[in-house]
Amino acid sequence: MLFRSYGAQQAFLGYQSYIIDPISNNPYEQSYISNIESSQNRHYLNVINNGFHRKTSFNFSGLYENILHLGFNINQHRIDFINDQEFFEGEQDLNSLIYDVSFDNKLISYGEGFSLQFGTILKLNNIRLGLSYDSPQWFEINDETIQKISSYRYDGEFEIKENINPEITNTYRPYNIKIPSKVSASFAYVFNERGLFSIEYSSQNLSNSYLSDNGASSY
């Protein structure tokens, strides 16, 4: 068999762990049969997510006659995210050639982004009027995957555990994400030193989100 791309690696893991067999010896064969007899199989899926979105801002501000406040931010974003999944399938049919399968798939995503923010507050006696604009957030993201699989089978009277761990990190072409801009307006009334009343309205059209296809692949 020839192994290319993400899809081919899935076939490689399945074949080397005896979960699947090709229907012929043709090296270009793409049809397989399963060596697992499905009945009342029990499935477990453990998922662990962790990561962060860090934003570093460079701030500029100004004040005009203690009436008009202006602010401007330049933001640099950093994203690191790990999705770690462990899938287990057990309690196969007694006639199954393969049983107790464990598949680990780790997705690592990281990248950097950029955005701008502008805001102003107008002070009129006890009234405060605010307006802010958040530019779109542009990101370039990289994805990597690491996979391994294990299974059990019998060879005569002997139980054999197959551990297939290529120790390969699959890397994919970067892709771009754009999170749409947001506009906010606010009103506040200050009751001297006794309190205040405020209201804020924000608008963001998420249908303008963008995901490029530069990194499109079978995964």
Which residues does each predicted region cover?
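Outer-membrane beta-barrel porins/channels
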Residues: 1-219
